[in-house]
Amino acid sequence: MTPKRQFRSALVGEHQFISRFMSNDWELRGPDGVVARMRRVASTHTSLVWLPDGRKLELEPAGWGTVVAVGDSEKAKIERQSWWGRRWEVSGATFGYELTSDPTPRRWTLRIGGHPIGRLAGTAWSYNRLDVHTDVAVPVHALILSWHVIARPWEAAAAPRVLKPLAAPKAL
């Protein structure tokens, strides 16, 4: 019998977000294989996330410049802290980080109290691959929300339900 791989809720070291060119399907990969699978739904500014332990999350707008990761409850959120979208606050029940854009294009840093604890870097021409290196364990939710903001910033800045169809009003 093959043992089932245990899901790690926090990651440390080298990982990559990878997608084929012009694809809405992404994977977060690490040394042990696929950590999460994501699918962008551009028409609604959301992303669906499947974790190896069977849980499913939805990343959805919750106000101008705010994105939340929702499963059976809100797991984490990321909020824009600067007008240009170069600084974001990533938070959850047990963590809080700052995601800041570096002066070098396509380079971002995760910080705690101003101290860098992780780096995220896109390739020279696109974000179809986003390399991640963390010095300390960072929750998967924080990395996935960071990916959502870095790879698709206009979706992160969208207002809730801008493109989602609303249910028809009930007749009285």
Task: State each model region's role.
Residues 1-172:
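Intrinsically disordered, low-complexity proline/glycine-rich segments
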